[in-house]
Amino acid sequence: MIVSIVDYGSGNVRSLINAVRYLGFETQWIRNPHDIEKAECLIFPGVGNFGFVCDSLAKQGFLEPLRRYALSGKPFMAVCVGIQALFEGSVEAPHSKGLGVFPGLVQRFDNDDKTVPHIGWNSCAVRSDTSKEFFGMRPHDKFYFVHSYMIPEKGLILPPEFKIATTKYGNETFVGAIVKNNFLATQFHPEKSGSAGLRCLKAFLTGNYEQPISGEASKLIENSFGGLTKRIIACLDVRSNDAGDLVVTKGDQYDVREKSSGSEVRNLGKPVELCQRYFQEGADEVVFLNITSFRNCPMADAPMLQVLEKAAQTVFVPLTVGGGIRDVSDPDGTFHPAVEVAGIYFRSGADKVSIGSDAVYAAEKYYENGKKLSGKTAIETISKAYGNQAVVISVDPKRQYVKVPEDTKHHVVKTSRLGPNGEAYCWYQCTVKGGREYRDIDVVELTRACEAMGAGEVLLNCMDQDGSNAGYDIELVRLVKNSVNIPVIASSGAGIPQHFEEVFKETDCDAALAAGIFHRQTCRIEDVKEYLAIHDVLVRT
């Protein structure tokens, strides 16, 4: 069977194609309305925002043919924004028309009791019948979600032949999937949901709609907040060594060279091989940080694109890439806006892009302009095209001590780690260019500005803790977590499993990232998750 995939110019569809091919099926693109009518099995991927997706479909004449196909009884699957597009419209794009397969309007999550976007691994189950798996979806499984808009379960009425699998996030219950024979629409990304997602995708492709289950597989794992787990993220700091090879390295307070006389770049292995290992060991996400990219033009950064392409062929969890996501000009003067640069990374297999120095410069201009949005920053243009969940800001702050809060205009915390002269307060100064240049902006100002511009997540590093194995900077993570309404990833300093428990329980951050300890296997991902599960932290196992 050949699987036809709708092509409307969206972001990372490569991973979906890779997953289908990994399972042994051929793929082909749908590029015109006639291709839809001829398809024997069709997948409608959803990457981007509702308006971009539905307007692109309308422009290409796909709306009505796709609607007819969805109702035809032939194998049909929709993913993420794809399930939203099956409804009449969305508050995300009030002037854009959906397919209208189902009645209703897509809504935005409220952030009264939670961060938005909803990012991470959550449950998805037909709660009225947990003794069965539908298209391989088991109540015990966790699937990867990344979205700010959803279809509320409350008030939803579908034809009786359809079953609804729901997901809980804070005070809201929404549609995680809609199923019937030969029909599967998921809010989660099966191609990014590890073995559970591959099982779901395979069940759809083989027509395995319904199977009885029992025991652990039938048990929902949730807490009072829902089924969303804390994420454990592995980070690969990638750069060229002195021989020109792309290697994974690790810094000690941002210094990546050995202390020996040769001072060579610290080499911890090949990026693709390590990425594959982390996937097999249970990493919930993998981050590639191209830490020397500010010295090069990313449009010509072929090795990094090749790493992404190869990793995405066999790694079925989210991949984030950072470094060089900005407006650039080629040596011949050809200009490439940041959204175009991001698009190249997405089409190579990235799910999210991480913006570092450019986020700081954009935040400075945001305040200079009286907190007015320009609409031209990398954060704004990328989030508009691909959704704010596709944009991560990577923050590199360093502690600056003061005797009393009045000694600075910046946001301070009372600290238990006294300064060199006994100072009891500090603020966190943001840096650019890999920590080599300091700017007059603090971490609260930066993250709030970036949230306003459309960033969907904060990757919070700490120059003081980097490579220390002494634990995360709890005061820093708590400060930022309490300052924004988007997810926060704690980074820098993890050395033992207890450090992960500490940062989750004391700050309620959404994810924790580590690099060196996973590279060297002084602490394994499995060890961290086993420890957290024993200590009542909900994780994907």
Curated annotation (Swiss-Prot):
Q: Name one GO molecular function term.
A: lyase activity
Which sites are catalytic? Answer: C80 (for gatase activity), H189 (for gatase activity), E191 (for gatase activity), D237, D396
* Record's GO cellular component terms: cytosol; nucleus
Listed PROSITE patterns: GATASE_TYPE_1 (PS51273)
According to the record, the residues making up region (Cyclase) are 228-541
Q: Does the keyword Lyase apply?
A: yes
Q: Which Pfam families match?
A: GATase, His_biosynth
Q: In which pathway does it act?
A: Amino-acid biosynthesis; L-histidine biosynthesis; L-histidine from 5-phospho-alpha-D-ribose 1-diphosphate: step 5/9
Gene3D superfamilies per UniProt: 3.40.50.880, Aldolase class I
Question: What are the entry keywords?
Answer: Amino-acid biosynthesis, Glutamine amidotransferase, Histidine biosynthesis, Hydrolase, Lyase, Multifunctional enzyme
Name the reaction it catalyses: 5-[(5-phospho-1-deoxy-D-ribulos-1-ylimino)methylamino]-1-(5-phospho-beta-D-ribosyl)imidazole-4-carboxamide + L-glutamine = D-erythro-1-(imidazol-4-yl)glycerol 3-phosphate + 5-amino-1-(5-phospho-beta-D-ribosyl)imidazole-4-carboxamide + L-glutamate + H(+); L-glutamine + H2O = L-glutamate + NH4(+)
| EC number annotated for this UniProt entry | 4.3.2.10, 3.5.1.2
Which InterPro entries does this UniProt record tie to the protein?
Answer: Aldolase_TIM, Class_I_gatase-like, GATASE, His_biosynth, HisF, IGPS_HisA/HisF, IGPS_HisHF, Imidazole-glycPsynth_HisH
Q: What does this protein do?
A: IGPS catalyzes the conversion of PRFAR and glutamine to IGP, AICAR and glutamate. The glutaminase domain produces the ammonia necessary for the cyclase domain to produce IGP and AICAR from PRFAR. The ammonia is channeled to the active site of the cyclase domain.
Designated name of the protein: Imidazole glycerol phosphate synthase hisHF
